[in-house]
Amino acid sequence: NFDEIDRSGFGFN
């Protein structure tokens, strides 16, 4: 998901 902050906090998960 590049649209929002994910588990890693980068939003690349």
From Swiss-Prot:
Tissue specificity of this protein: Abdominal nerve cord and hindgut.
Keywords from the UniProt entry: Neuropeptide, Secreted
Keyword Secreted: yes
Stretches of the chain forming a coiled coil according to its record: none
Subcellular localization, as worded in the UniProt entry: Secreted
One GO-annotated biological process of the protein: neuropeptide signaling pathway
Gene Ontology CC annotation, any one: extracellular region
Domain of life: Eukaryota
Role description: Myotropic peptide, enhances both the frequency and amplitude of spontaneous hindgut contractions.
Protein name from the UniProt record: Orcokinin
Organism: Faxonius limosus (Spinycheek crayfish)
